[in-house]
Amino acid sequence: MTVTEHRPWRGVLVATALPFDEDLRVDHGRYAEHCAWLVENGCDGVVPNGSLGEYQVLTPEERAKVVETAVAAVGGARVMPGVAAYGSAEARRWAEQARDAGCASVMLLPPNAYRADERSVLAHYAEVAKAGVPIVAYNNPIDTKVDLVPELLARLHAEGHIHAVKEFSGDVRRAYRIAELAPELDLLIGADDVLLELALAGAKGWVAGYPNALPRESVRLYRAAVSGDLDTAKESYSQLHPLLRWDSRVEFVQAIKLSMDVVGRHGGPVRPPRVPLLPEQEAAVRAATEKAVAAGWA
């Protein structure tokens, strides 16, 4: 089966939160259980070592073991690790590690140690593509200051470096331009709070944050949206949006982990330099999550 036929990045892939114990050590047992629980509750796969997974504060040994833990829990076909790094050679090594662990695809940010120009972006993706594992580009110009605009995405796709893009710019208009320039490039919803808009624009998947806490309702929302069941999708989306919008805020990791705690999962602490939510932030997240629980969505 070809990469184009398989497309393992389609569907609901959860950018997994990473559990730490009280001493801030990675709890691999809890992480394995969490990955399995997400799949059991309808999610199509997991994305370890993304921003939500706090990969920036992991040691290389921890980061590698997180991938191996996810693969052991749900199988490599369901695992798409983030392989971001400051250098192209290091990112390629992470892609090779994912490949050797059995992962079917990887997710890659552009260079983000500085504001890379187009030639640097092309060279970066070309180098990591040498690992031989399909790449999903991750466009997050808000945090990286490097914007994978539709024209650049089309070129990356035409040169065979990427097969899909996680689109986190917040500009839903881009979906239509991407479809015009690169119709075979899969668009993945990259921010929870534009899910409905991008689903209607033809998205093929969702790299998601809030299913960490509410997988069944999140999957129901996604399936309704992409199938055109707008009555179901709009009602669910409107009710969940007070939570979903936290995925686009600076405190998204803390918010999603708190929601996990509220619904009875283990979200737990974050590693520094992240700090706990302010009292008013915690109250808002807790209230919105408790409302979702009362509605039977957890």
Where are these regions (language model features)?
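C-terminal alpha-helical cap/extension of soluble enzyme domains
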Residues: T2, P8, L13-A17, W37, ...
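Active-site beta->alpha loop and helix N-cap motifs at the rims of alpha/beta catalytic domains
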Residues: T2-K145, R155, A298
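A general structural signal for well-ordered alpha-helical segments in protein cores
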Residues: Y31, R63, V67, A91, ...
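Short helix-capping segments at alpha-helix termini
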Residues: A72-A77, D100-G102, A131-V133, H157-H161, ...
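Catalytic alpha/beta core domains of metabolic enzymes, predominantly
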Residues: A131, I142-V250
